[in-house]
From Swiss-Prot:
The gene is eif3a. RNA-binding component of the eukaryotic translation initiation factor 3 (eIF-3) complex, which is involved in protein synthesis of a specialized repertoire of mRNAs and, together with other initiation factors, stimulates binding of mRNA and methionyl-tRNAi to the 40S ribosome. The eIF-3 complex specifically targets and initiates translation of a subset of mRNAs involved in cell proliferation. This is Eukaryotic translation initiation factor 3 subunit A. One of its GO terms (biological process) is formation of cytoplasmic translation initiation complex. One of its GO terms (cellular component) is eukaryotic translation initiation factor 3 complex.
Length: 1391
């Protein structure tokens, strides 16, 4: 394909231009490039004329291969678009080829018969001739005029058939071309081409059956397709018969039968009649008279059954032919000696079965069977009278002397009907042979010896030589017992008495047996005669005795017949079973052998396929490489030829031979070309320089010479111009004068018409003025009407707009009033509910105080008992000083390892019964795999708390002030040294203590340490360390934060009992069945279950569930100040809300608000402890103190449990100790003895009723907020909490905060700490002096409930305020929060 792109129209035009000048090859190349172009793969109307012109050129130039390639390309182009165009193009192509061939045939006298195969024109004779004459084979063939065109036409037919095969869209065209090809072979007697054509059609048919899944495949089940194939095969059969190619005709018959087998419907009777007629001809030509007669029988029966208009003459003609064909069958089948010796009977039978299959017969026919069928179907009655008796003479009558004479008359009549019945003439020789054989058989039964001349006189239609040959053949094949005596010229019959006839000996008219047959059956005949004689001469009593014996035998048989029959059946059954078993074994063995053989064959086949595949790949690679090499050589050759055509290339490559392509490459050619270009360029530049110099000198010399001549010419031109100007000026003046005179004359002549003109104009204006005024008046009227209509429409629209606005305002006012009414109803309902809750809470407090009083008394008794036991134990030990010093419970506690984190040596002295506190040396946190089991245990413990409260639980809740002061073990005693966290003789309080990790919601140790815990008690139950500090302890506070806070929850605390002692209210976190256990920061379990079950799970630092609630979170609001769902961490928890790891507020605070300010923006203390897992967590609120339980993994434990992880952000154990934790107060918390007041969460009915009431009374649901509102709400929460922490006063740092001399040191802040600190500093709002309204303090008159504190959004985010904050800031909002403070210091939120 050329490098340039050419449109199809331009290519056709270009080709026509080439044809006009007689250049057919360039025109063909142009069209070929367009057809092969990949840019023209879509059929266009211009493609058809291009293809016709292309094929015309191919025919003219006899380029059959180019025509084939073009047709294939055109098929791909138009197959899916316009298949009719392909049919037209192919028909036109074949028509052109046929016309050219016919023209060559008319103009040539040379015949094509001397060349047997057009594909193999080169014969041995032509090779010798070319060697002698030195003439090329193709030249000799081209010199012949007709042969090349016949070959071209044959190739055209074959190429078109290959092109159209197995394509249902051009199936009709395919069969038309196939029939044309058969006619071509018949016309030019091309036998070799006919065989090839038959093979091709047979191969195409097999491909149709094999590739039936293609989109354009032919469906052989289609009746139209079957009829077309049968039609083509019948034409093939006719052509084969006409050309006497009987082998090809037989193959065509097999193909037709195969098509019949494919068809589900029977073929048409006309088609079957034609088929039987052709097949009968093939059988007769092949010498198979038996199947020829059988075919005629089938044709006769088909015609009688299917043809309704069958005439009597046709019946006679068909019956006569069937009779003659049947009687023409040889009496005995001919079988040669070699066939008898080789035992070819099986092969012959197989061949006969195949032939019978072609006729639809179940078994091969026989001569006797056909004759019987002919008689049975009464076919003889339709035979012409002249031939009717032939059957009786040959098959029934025994009359040897007149047999040949009678048959001769019939044969003479048949010969006379040669013109009317030509097909009957072929049976005459066979009938004569059968007549001679019948004559010999009958003569052999009559005569023992007969003269040859006498026998010859009985057979008048043959000569002596043929008669002798017939006698010899009869003796060989027909078991005729005859001997020829040439000396006496006689024939002897039956002379050999030892001769035995064959079983298949022919039957015919019979008179008597031959002597040999009589000798062979003599004993049989004698036996029959003797048995008859014995029967005649036997006496009567012998016959009677024989009859009696016969009856006895019959009776015995009848008696034992059934038993014998059963025995025979059983034996037969046994034999059958044994045979079946043997057969099954044989079948199984054969099957196994077959499978083994098949596996081996499969393996060999796979190996062979793999080898062939590899060879094919290698061949394909070699072919591709060769193609690439050829393309490369072709490119180089074309490039060299193009370059050599130029003047530059001719010079550069004059010494290079194009044939030596192996030594050349494109780079070499390009280098030579560039070198020659550079050389010529240099020569051209030098030549141009020389020429430039020469021209420069020449021009300078010319200008020097022409200067004086130019001056002279200038002067002459100036003078001439002056004279010309003067002459023209005079002519102009004279012309102007003449024009002036003519203008004056015209003015005078036209001035007489002025008055008439003015009169005409005035009349015209007067007539038009009235018309103008009328139109103007009409316009003014229409303008007024349109203006009035528009004003009316505008008035109506304004009126409608005012009405709509009025109704809309009215509806809005009604809606506002309805909302206000609803708000008032909700407020009243909430007020009633709050009063009811307060009453229930008071009842609950009273019951709880009674329970605590009982527990305190039990505890005191148990303490006294334990004190007496301890004293007796110390006295029994011998009064050692060390033990006496520690004899008191408090002194011993000072040195116990669980309090001061003693050295390993000291920890070894701890009694083994206290190992449960440390968790033992090998104690490790245990993760609970089944949270449901733990919750069931917890609930069981809570349900039995009143009946099974142990003395140990009571001892931990109560402290005895007097005993503490006497023993010097008071926790508030200032002489004991620094508070918790700074003591040298005690470990830090429970952090990662000796008792193992604190109880968490991920542990499988059962419920948290509660009232009926059956394990070793936690601090204070039966502990020798003394009870924990209670709220009524008069000792110094062990929580070293400040002194002005109320005490932690104790037994006699008037704030109401801790959670977990009463069954009426919802238990605190960790004991509730309905809620999940408290969550840690990085807990990846299910969602945290608190008061509200529809919230998302609580998030932690390393939680992989996505980010926690931040500014960009679109989930519902977190529990905060205004959340009426109750605080998350315990119903009565007065602490601030739990903080998340993305919280931008200040560091988290402890449990009271009266202490120093929280860590704020300007705090210069150490890094905060808590939220970040890679920083040391806070102990309460300061960094310098001993570490509290949790939050950091790289610090030491307070109780020596160095290998036990502490609780914190990454701790999967239980939650931290909350404000309502029943494990005793935490060190560092508020110790103020102010009575404890329950929050609004302590309501009767449980948290579910409160949640339901909240949802009924509150505003829109949490999840119904827009993402922007929820984001603002959370930002408001965080910023408000930060501001509240920053407003707290700074407290003095105590030794407890600095952590004493503990070996644990805060770890270095990680790079992430500074980043998070910077982020929090940037986001933190400015500090204010406003106190936290939801904390209790002594210096305040009132306390607000956790939900009652309004939030304020950060300054940067005030424009994003959500619906919660808007209802506080906007007075018009119906849902506005109204905090009210009662006399007890509690704040109630009214909405």
């Amino acid at each position: 394909m050329p490098a340039y792109f050419q449109r199809p129209e331009n290519a056709l035009k270009r080709a026509n231009e080439f044809l006009e000048v007689g250049k057919k090859q360039p025109a063909l190349d142009v069209l070929y490039d367009v057809i092969k172009s990949k840019k023209h793969r879509t059929w266009q109307k211009i493609h058809e004329p291009i293809m016709l012109k292309y094929l015309e050129l191919c025919v003219d130039l006899r380029k059959s291969h180019l025509a084939k390639e073009g047709l294939y390309q055109y098929k791909n182009i138009c197959q899916q678009v316009n298949i009719k165009s392909l049919e037209d193009v192919v028909r036109a192509y074949l028509k052109l080829a046929e016309e050219r061939t016919e023209a060559a045939k008319e103009s040539s006298q040379q015949m094509v018969l001397d060349i047997e195969d057009l594909d193999n024109i080169q014969t041995p004779e032509s090779v010798l001739l070319s060697a002698v004459s030195g003439e090329d084979t193709q030249d000799r063939t081209d010199r012949l005029l007709l042969t090349p065109w016949v070959k071209f036409l044959w190739e055209s037919y074959r190429q078109c058939l290959d092109l159209l095969r197995n394509n249902s869209k051009v199936e009709r065209l395919y069969h038309d071309i196939a029939q044309q090809a058969f006619k071509f072979c018949l016309l030019y007697t091309r036998k070799a081409e006919f065989r090839k054509l038959c093979d091709n059609l047979r191969m195409h048919l097999s491909q149709i059956q094999r590739h039936h899944n293609q989109s354009t495949a032919i469906n052989l089940n289609n009746p139209e397709s079957q009829s077309m194939h049968l039609e083509t095969r019948l034409v093939q059969l006719d052509s084969a018969i006409s050309m006497e190619l009987w082998q090809e005709a037989f193959k065509a018959v097999e193909d037709i039968h195969g098509l019949f087998a494919l068809s589900k419907k029977p073929p048409k009777p006309q088609l079957m009649a034609n088929y039987y007629n052709k097949v009968s001809t093939v059988f007769w030509k092949s010498g198979n008279t038996l199947f020829h007669a059988s075919t005629l029988h089938r044709l006769y029966h088909l015609s009688r059954e299917m043809r309704k208009n069958l005439t009597q003459e046709e019946m006679q003609r068909m019956s006569t032919r069937v009779l003659l064909a049947t009687l023409s069958i040889p009496i005995t089948p001919e079988r040669t000696d070699i066939a008898r010796l080789l035992d070819m009977d099986g092969i012959i039978l197989e061949k006969q079965r195949r032939l019978a299959t072609l006729l639809g017969l179940q078994a091969p026919p026989t001569r006797v069977g056909l004759i019987n069928d002919m008689v049975r179907f009464n076919m003889l009655q339709y035979v012409v009278p002249e031939v009717k008796e032939l059957y009786n003479w040959l098959e029934m009558d025994f009359h040897p002397l007149k047999l040949c004479t009678r048959v001769t008359k019939v044969l003479d009549w048949v010969k006379e009907q040669a013109e009317k019945e030509p097909e009957l003439q072929q049976y005459v020789p066979q009938l004569q042979s059968n007549t001679i054989l019948r004559l010999l058989q009958q003569v052999a039964q009559l005569y023992q010896t007969i003269e040859f001349s006498r026998l010859a006189s009985l057979v008048p239609f043959v000569d002596a030589f043929l008669l002798e040959r017939a006698i010899v053949d009869a003796a060989r094949h027909c078991d005729l017992q005859v001997r020829i005596d040439h000396s006496s010229r006689t024939l002897s019959f039956g002379s050999d008495l030892n001769y035995s006839t064959r079983e298949d000996a022919p039957f015919g008219p019979f008179l008597q047996n031959m002597p040999s047959e009589q000798i062979r059956n003599q004993l049989t005949a004698m036996s029959c005669v003797l048995s008859k004689a014995v029967g005649a001469i036997k006496p009567a009593h012998v016959l009677q005795e024989k009859e009696e014996q016969h009856q006895i035998a019959i009776t015995a048989y009848q008696k034992n017949s059934r038993k014998e029959h059963q025995r025979i059946l059983a034996r037969r059954q046994t034999i059958e079973e044994r045979k079946e078993r043997l057969e099954n074994l044989n079948i199984q063995r054969e099957k196994e052998e077959m499978e083994q053989k098949e596996a081996e064959l499969q393996k060999v086949r796979k190996a062979e396929e793999e080898r062939l595949r590899q060879e094919a790949k290698e061949r394909e690679k070699e072919r591709i490489l060769q193609e690439h090499e050829q393309i490369k050589k072709k490119t180089v050759r074309e490039r060299l030829e193009q370059i050599k055509k130029t003047e530059l290339g001719a010079k550069a490559f004059k010494d290079i031979d194009i044939e030596n392509l192996e030594e050349l490459d494109p780079d070499f050619i390009m280098a030579k070309q560039v070198e020659q270009l550079e050389k010529e360029k240099k020569e051209l530049q030098e030549r141009l320089k020389n020429q430039e110099k020469k021209i420069d000198y020449f021009e300078r010399a010319k200008r020097l010479e022409e200067i004086p001549l130019l001056k002279k010419a200038y002067e002459e031109q100036r003078i001439n111009d002056m004279e010309l100007w003067e002459l023209q000026e005079e002519e102009r003046i004279s012309t102007l004068l003449l024009e002036r005179e003519k203008a004056v004359e015209h003015k005078n002549r036209m001035s007489r018409m002025v008055e008439d003109k003015e009169l005409f104009v005035s009349k015209l204006k007067a007539s038009r003025q009235s018309l103008y005024e009328a139109k103007l008046k009409q316009f003014q009227e229409r303008l007024a009407e349109e203006k009035a209509a528009r004003l009316e429409e505008r008035k109506r629209e304004r009126k409608e707009e005012r009405r709509v606005n009025y109704y809309r305002d009215k509806e809005e006012e009604e809606e506002r009033l309805r909302e206000e009414q609803l708000k008032q109803e909700r407020e009243e309902q909430e007020k009633v509910e709050n009063e009811k809750r307060e009453a229930e809470q008071r009842d609950y407090q009273e019951r709880l105080k009674k329970l605590e009083e009982q527990e305190r008394k039990k505890r005191q008794r148990e303490l006294e008992i334990e004190e007496r036991e301890r004293k007796r134990e110390e006295e029994r030990r011998g009064g050692d000083d060390t033990f006496r010093k520690d004899s008191s419970r408090w002194g011993e506690r000072e040195e116990s390892g669980w309090r001061r984190g003693a050295d390993p040596d000291e920890r070894k002295q701890v009694p083994p019964e206290r190992d449960w506190r440390r968790g033992g040396p090998d104690s490790k946190p245990v993760i609970n795999e089944d949270a449901s089991n733990r919750e069931e245990d917890e609930n069981a413990a809570l349900r039995k708390d009143e009946e099974q409260v142990s003395s140990r639980a009571f001892e931990e809740k109560v402290s005895l002030p007097d005993a503490d002061e006497e023993k010097g073990g008071s926790w508030r005693d200032e002489d004991r040294g620094p508070k918790r966290g700074l003591e040298e003789d005690r470990g830090p309080r429970r952090g990662i203590d000796d008792a193992g990790p604190r109880r968490g919601f991920e542990e499988d140790r059962g419920p948290r340490r509660g009232i009926e815990d059956d394990r070793a008690p936690r601090r204070g139950f039966d502990d020798d360390r003394g009870p924990r500090r209670g709220f009524d302890d008069d000792r110094g506070p062990r929580r070293g934060f400040d002194e002005d806070r109320g005490p932690r929850r104790g037994i006699d605390d008037d704030r109401g009992p801790r959670r977990g002692f009463d069954e009426d209210r919802t238990p605190r976190r960790g004991f509730d069945d309905d809620r999940g256990p408290r969550r840690g920061f990085d807990d990846d379990r299910g969602p945290r279950r608190g008061f509200d079950e529809d919230r998302g799970p609580r998030r932690g630092f390393e939680d992989d569930r996505g980010p926690r609630r931040g500014f960009e979170d679109d989930r519902g609001p977190r529990r905060g100040f205004e959340d009426d769902r109750g605080p998350r961490r315990g119903f009565e928890d007065d602490r601030g809300p739990r903080r998340g790891f993305e919280d931008d507020r200040g560091p988290r605070r402890g449990f009271d608000e009266d202490r120093g300010p929280r860590r704020g923006f300007e705090d210069d203390r150490g890094p905060r402890r808590g939220f970040d897992e890679d920083r040391t967590p806070r102990r309460g609120f300061d960094d310098d103190r001993g570490p509290r339980r949790g939050l950091d993994e790289d610090r030491g434990s307070w109780r020596g449990g160095d290998d036990v992880p502490r609780r914190g952000a990454d701790d999967d154990r239980g939650p931290r100790r909350g404000a309502d934790d029943d494990r005793g107060p935490r060190r560092g918390e508020d110790r103020d003895q102010t009575p404890w007041k329950p929050m609004a969460a302590s309501r009767p009915g449980g948290w579910r009723e409160r949640e339901k009431a909240r949802e009924d009374s509150w505003g829109p649901p949490r999840d119904s907020q827009a993402p922007e509102e929820r984001e603002w709400s959370r930002q408001g929460e965080d910023s408000e909490k930060d501001s509240e922490r920053d407003r707290r006063p700074v407290r003095e740092e105590s030794a407890w905060r600095r952590g004493g001399d503990n070996s644990e040191t805060p770890r270095k802040p990680s790079p992430g700490d500074s980043d998070r600190k910077d982020d929090s500093d940037k986001k933190r709002p400015p500090k204010t002096d406003e106190a936290n309204p939801w904390r209790r303090g002594e210096d305040k008159d009132s306390r607000e409930e956790e939900r009652g504190t309004p939030r304020r959004a950060p300054a940067a985010d005030r424009e994003k305020s959500a619906w919660r904050t808007e209802k506080k800031e906007e007075k018009d909002t119906p849902r506005r929060i109204k905090p009210e403070t009662d006399e007890d210091g509690w704040t109630t939120v009214r909405r």
